From Swiss-Prot:
Purpose: Interacts with the SecY protein in vivo. May bind preferentially to an uncomplexed state of SecY, thus functioning either as a chelating agent for excess SecY in the cell or as a regulatory factor that negatively controls the translocase function.
One Gene Ontology cellular component: cytoplasmic side of plasma membrane
Organism (species): Pectobacterium atrosepticum (strain SCRI 1043 / ATCC BAA-672)
Record-given protein name: Protein Syd
Family of the protein in this entry: Belongs to the Syd family.
Keyword hit for tRNA-binding: no
A Pfam family recorded for this sequence: Syd
C-alpha cells in the first residue's frame, strides 16, 4: 500500500507541475514560501520562489509522532509525508477545493510532526477516532484527513465527529485529484 501512495503522490505531483507549466509557463511558484530555505528551490525572483519536488531524506520518518503519543500511525501517512519535499499543492477533488499539504524542508518536517501531535492530542481529549490531516480546505473548520484506523480519506469538521467519506484509500484520493495552478 505504501508503494501505491508514493506512486500516486508522484503522479499527482507530475500533473501539478505540468499544469503550472502549461497554464503559467513556469514551475510552481509561491510568495508564501519566499525566503524559507528548502531543497526544492530552483529560483528566487522578486518576492516569489519557483520550486520543483525533491526526494525526501531517506532516514526520516514519523517515529516522533508515534513515540510522543504511543500510537502506531497508518503506513499510508508515513509514505505520504516522507516521499518528497515540495510546496503545498492546490487541487480539486470532485467539487472540493483543497491544498494538499507537503513538507518543504527538514525544519518543516519537524513543525508538521508537532502539528500532527497537537491534532491527535486534541482528538484524544475529545474522545474522537484519530485522524491525520493531509489537506486544508477553503473553510478553516474542515480538513481532509486519513482515518488512522481504517485508512479511508474523510472530510472532517475540526473537533467534531462529523466526517464525510471521500475515498477508500489515500492512493485513490491522490489519483482522483485534479491540479490547480493558483
Amino acid at each position: 500500500m505504501e508503494h501505491e501512495v508514493v506512486s500516486a503522490l508522484a503522479a499527482f505531483t507530475q500533473r501539478y507541475v505540468a499544469c503550472w507549466q502549461q497554464e503559467k509557463g513556469h514551475l510552481p511558484a509561491s510568495e508564501a514560501l519566499y525566503g524559507i530555505p528548502s531543497p526544492c528551490i530552483v529560483e528566487n525572483h522578486e518576492d516569489t520562489v519557483y520550486w520543483s519536488p525533491q526526494p525526501f531524506a531517506p532516514s526520516v520518518a514519523l517515529d516522533g509522532v508515534e513515540r510522543a503519543l504511543e500510537i502506531s500511525l497508518h503506513p499510508d501517512v508515513h509514505a505520504f509525508y516522507t516521499a518528497q519535499y515540495a510546496g503545498d499543492m492546490a487541487a480539486q477533488f470532485d467539487s472540493l477545493s483543497c491544498q494538499l499539504l507537503q513538507v518543504w524542508s527538514e525544519e518543516d518536517f519537524t513543525r508538521m510532526q508537532e502539528n500532527l501531535i497537537g491534532h491527535l492530542l486534541t482528538q484524544k481529549r475529545l474522545k474522537l477516532t484519530p485522524t491525520l490531516f493531509l489537506a486544508t480546505t477553503d473553510s478553516e473548520m474542515t480538513m481532509v484527513s486519513l482515518c488512522n484506523v481504517s485508512g479511508e480519506i474523510v472530510l472532517e469538521a475540526f473537533g467534531t465527529k462529523k466526517r464525510q467519506h471521500l475515498a477508500p484509500t489515500l492512493a485513490a484520493f491522490l489519483s482522483g485529484l485534479n491540479p490547480l495552478a493558483v
